[in-house]
């Protein structure tokens, strides 16, 4: 059941003027409005109820509803929005769908014939008291002045060829994508006028941030009405043909996004960014289908850097009467897109960051995108920070006081791992000032031009040459990069992430999938030929030897191997680090929780021993829930337990039993540090499964 509660939509009924010792009659409140089912199918009766509390006398309620058919969208500013409403009385008689007479819950049933596939139905409630005074729900001041539901019978199958006009039989072959394939990735339906959609995405070529058009977004059966939208992006906003979108939700009606596994994010979104999953054609990487950013942002996040959540979706735009015309380049299906969490106050809440100032950085300066409570409003905090590091060399204490160095080392490490070098022009990152620590953090953004050494930029963001030239900072940075190489950016762990993400949008067995349907929709779409340049036709999978999506995944995995070798040779070549320790055999790969004892080799290195530490992390595919694809697989960089740094060498450790669970698989490692602050590589792991208790 869809419900919105309206505590501030009321009729004020006064028995007499308020004065000392004189009571005011209770105000008539419309406390709740709901409809069921939440997303009806064709031919279903829809029940609408409204609850009224503290009735001061006879009250009547009625519903007004407006029908919006496919291809006939009605904007909020259209005259038809004001006039095209039909009236039905609601009742509290215990009849005609009402459950109980006189309980203050009013009911009306919208007839089955009203529900037609792809139809949007808006409604609002009006209450009238015995004196003729009226009020409505939603309130007239509400940014969404009506409720709504969307009638839908399910995503249909779709058919398309790689190039229906080709002389190549393989490209011309029509492939049928059945409804199960088309429903394998969550769908967002967007209802608007055809001209509004075309103007925003192709015709007007507007480079500004003004939201000129509105539409209705439907996700998980919930309707977000009168949402503003525009194309998004910088200099290449309209260059790819299949362009990016940005939606701005109404105040008080944030968007409940869900991840790739259907789980709702903890914090709702005020804005929705859609990546087009198309890549700039001249870089040869088209067909990665959003994998670069999905995996890339996961790497940032796993390394401890606050980074946008992402999830895939298929965008279905309803601006025509027909859902699936014979022309594969028309109709509702617009292909595969990647949703990116907007970097704003919602982002800070989602990532558990204190409420501080957040700046979108462009052209060497910043625009306040979120104002933290109690923080400055004139950007003086940003100006002071930038002025300080741009004028003269700052000493180590200044950097430690003003920049979150631990976070920066992780940020810089992932920049190197995925070649996120498009940061050199003062863009593609945000600055965030943590009000509790007083330190600035860098938050990554726009990481599509990655995973290949020919991508744009030289990687020279503001802190690389200013921070990492300090010897102490350089050692600390290398320590972190070395750890990320051991535990995250390696063929096994990053390869696991690549496979995990790819399985969301493609069939691991090689059957038809959304990536194939998207390729059929866009590789030879007429708009790609008209635009040319970074668009162009027939550019999917150029980087893959096998010329398919599976080949693009192999290209990413090969890049991990090659880039890791480059990092080791060029960024981590330090002969002074301690030797990598070894773990001595545990005697069994099946251990009980109370017998988790391990030993390591002696310290070895050119420097004097200073410290050591141990860690335990989950490893491998876990049982049950992961087989059902309802959760992500564990990554080794996320420890379940880490020891404190031990200043005295002790070759033995016993893992606390409470940190592991029976039936799970874990890895234990050890690491050594010398007196110069250099940490060794982590030891090769011992992997073990925790056996259930005996008996």
Set out the residue ranges of the language-model regions.
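Recognizes extended acidic, P/S/T-rich segments that occur
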Residues: 93-105, 114-115, 615-661
């Amino acid at each position: 059941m869809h419900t919105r509660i309206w505590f501030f939509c009321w009729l004020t009924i006064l028995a007499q003027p308020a004065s000392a010792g004189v009571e005011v009659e209770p105000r008539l409140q419309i406390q709740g409005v709901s409809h069921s089912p939440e997303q009806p199918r064709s031919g279903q009766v829809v029940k609408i109820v409204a609850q009224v509390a503290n009735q001061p006398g006879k009250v009547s309620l009625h519903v007004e509803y407006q029908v919006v058919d496919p291809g006939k969208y009605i904007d909020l500013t259209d005259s038809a929005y004001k006039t095209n409403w039909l009236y039905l009385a609601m009742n509290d008689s215990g009849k005609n769908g009402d459950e109980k007479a006189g309980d203050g819950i009013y009911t009306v049933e919208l007839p089955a014939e009203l529900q037609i596939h792809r139809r949007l139905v808006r409604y609002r409630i009006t209450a009238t008291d015995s004196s003729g005074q009226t009020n409505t729900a939603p309130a007239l001041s509400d940014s969404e002045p009506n409720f709504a539901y969307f009638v839908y019978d399910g995503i249909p199958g779709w058919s398309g060829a790689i190039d229906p006009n080709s002389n190549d039989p393989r490209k011309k072959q029509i492939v049928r994508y059945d409804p199960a394939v088309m429903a394998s990735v969550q769908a967002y339906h967007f209802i608007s006028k055809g001209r509004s959609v075309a103007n925003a995405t192709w015709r007007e070529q507007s480079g500004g941030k003004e939201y000129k058009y509105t539409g209705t977004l439907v996700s998980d059966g919930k309707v977000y009405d009168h949402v503003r939208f525009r194309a998004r992006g910088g200099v290449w906003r309209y260059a790819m043909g299949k362009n990016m979108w940005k939606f701005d939700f109404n105040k008080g009606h944030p968007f409940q996004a869900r991840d790739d596994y259907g789980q709702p994010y903890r914090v709702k979104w005020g804005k929705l960014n859609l990546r087009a999953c198309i890549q700039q054609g001249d870089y040869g990487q088209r067909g990665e289908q959003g994998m670069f950013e999905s995996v890339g942002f996961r790497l940032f996040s796993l390394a401890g850097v606050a980074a946008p959540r992402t999830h895939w979706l298929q965008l279905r735009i309803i601006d025509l009467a027909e859902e699936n015309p014979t022309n594969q380049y028309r109709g509702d299906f617009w292909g595969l897109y990647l949703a990116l969490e907007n970097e704003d106050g919602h982002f800070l809440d989602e990532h558990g960051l204190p409420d501080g100032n957040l700046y979108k950085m462009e052209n060497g300066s910043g625009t306040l995108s979120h104002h933290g409570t109690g923080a400055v409003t004139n950007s003086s905090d940003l100006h002071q920070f930038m002025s300080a590091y741009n004028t003269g060399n700052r000493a180590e204490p200044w950097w430690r006081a003003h920049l979150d160095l631990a976070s920066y080392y992780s940020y810089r490490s992932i920049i190197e791992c995925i070649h996120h070098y498009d940061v050199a022009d003062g863009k593609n990152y945000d600055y965030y000032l943590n009000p509790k620590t007083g330190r600035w953090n860098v938050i990554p953004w726009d990481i599509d031009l990655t995973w290949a050494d020919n991508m744009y930029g030289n990687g020279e963001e503001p802190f690389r040459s200013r921070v990492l030239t300090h010897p102490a900072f350089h050692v600390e940075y290398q320590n972190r990069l070395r750890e990320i190489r051991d535990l995250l950016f390696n063929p096994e762990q990053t390869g696991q992430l690549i496979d995990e993400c790819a399985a969301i949008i493609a069939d691991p067995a090689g059957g038809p999938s959304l990536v194939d349907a998207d390729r059929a929709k866009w590789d030879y779409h007429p708009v790609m030929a008209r635009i040319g340049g970074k668009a162009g036709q027939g550019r999917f999978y150029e980087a893959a030897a096998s010329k398919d999506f599976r080949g693009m995944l192999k290209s990413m995995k090969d890049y991990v191997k090659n880039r890791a070798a480059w990092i080791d040779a060029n960024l981590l070549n330090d002969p002074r680090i301690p030797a990598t320790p070894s773990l001595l055999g545990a005697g069994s790969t099946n251990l009980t929780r109370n017998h988790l004892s391990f030993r390591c080799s002696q310290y070895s290195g050119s420097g004097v021993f200073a410290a050591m530490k141990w860690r335990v992390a989950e490893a491998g595919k876990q049982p049950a829930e992961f087989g059902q694809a309802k959760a992500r697989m564990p990554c080794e960089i996320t420890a379940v337990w880490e020891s404190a740094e031990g200043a005295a060498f002790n070759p033995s450790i016993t893992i606390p039993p409470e940190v592991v669970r029976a039936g799970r698989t874990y890895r234990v490692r050890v690491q050594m540090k010398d007196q110069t602050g250099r940490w060794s590589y982590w030891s090769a792991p011992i992997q073990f499964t925790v056996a259930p208790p005996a008996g």
